[in-house]
């Protein structure tokens, strides 16, 4: 279990960032990764500021806006502004330069940035963004990213992303896509119980050595699952 207040923290004039796993100047030998999940950053960027053009190589990168508008630009001439209800994925492959900045001059942008280590290296860089609103269902977990082409965007790794909003007092069962894998749960808002453990806002938990498990919501919540 990774409690929210145990995460690494980087703070600059323009950025307030929490790191579930080792990143930037935060290093914990026990928190390098969870399977292929290498980075899970909870970022808040000041108006008009952001991550200027920088390179990535051989990494699957997913950005999920939680508030505000996030502007992406890259060396493959992709340019897009995404907001809540949309996500973007990028397979960096042989290499790509990109920027992510706050598109608003007056309001902060908050988003999750997630890095997944790919199973294939030096592939052709690919960018994709899309709406997840049509995929979401009340009190269900919707698969929004997968490796098998069943979702609008695919990753070069045996990884599934699920996201959902669930009312208080509901119970949900979850079956792993692969029996030898694991699931990482990140609670965006609310309070839930998983295997007797209570998770609160921005807590994370890895689940493995099981084929399925159940969660119960104590407060309305939105969570992201990485399987």
Which residues fall in each region the model found?
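Tight coil/turn sites that cap or link beta-strands
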Residues: 42, 47-48, 67, 85, ...
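Conserved small/polar residues in nucleotide/adenosyl-binding loops
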Residues: 220-227
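Short beta-strand His + acidic residue motifs that chelate non-heme Fe in jelly-roll/DSBH
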Residues: 72-75, 90-91, 97-105, 173-175, ...
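Glycine- and acidic-residue-biased ligand/ion/polar-headgroup-sensing regions
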Residues: 57-73, 84-87, 174-195, 201
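A short glycine-rich, His/Asp/Glu-containing loop-to-beta-strand
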Residues: 9-55, 60, 111, 118, ...
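Hydrophobic, well-structured mid-protein blocks that either form specific transmembrane helices
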Residues: 83-138
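Short acidic-glycine-tyrosine-enriched beta hairpin
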Residues: 76-91, 136-137, 195-214
């Amino acid at each position: 279990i990774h409690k929210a207040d145990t995460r690494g923290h980087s703070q600059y004039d323009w950025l307030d960032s929490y790191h579930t796993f080792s990143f930037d100047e935060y290093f914990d030998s026990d928190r390098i990764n969870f399977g292929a999940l290498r980075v899970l950053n909870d970022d808040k960027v000041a108006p008009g500021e952001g991550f200027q053009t920088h390179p990535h190589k051989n990494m699957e990168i997913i950005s999920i806006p939680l508030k505000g508008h996030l502007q992406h630009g890259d060396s493959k001439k992709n340019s897009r502004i995404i907001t809540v209800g949309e996500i973007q994925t990028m397979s960096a492959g042989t290499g790509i330069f990109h920027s992510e900045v706050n598109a608003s001059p007056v309001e902060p942008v908050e988003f999750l940035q997630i890095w997944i280590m790919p199973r294939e290296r030096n592939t052709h860089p690919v960018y994709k963004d899309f709406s997840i609103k049509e995929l979401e269902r009340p009190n269900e977990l919707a698969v929004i990213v997968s490796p098998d082409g069943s979702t609008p965007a695919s990753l070069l790794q045996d990884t599934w992303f699920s996201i959902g909003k669930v009312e208080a007092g509901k119970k949900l069962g979850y079956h792993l896509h692969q029996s030898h894998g694991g699931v990482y749960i990140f609670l965006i808002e609310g309070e839930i119980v998983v295997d007797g453990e209570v998770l609160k806002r921005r807590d994370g938990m890895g689940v493995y050595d099981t084929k399925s498990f159940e969660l119960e919501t104590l407060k309305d919540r939105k969570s992201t699952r990485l399987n």
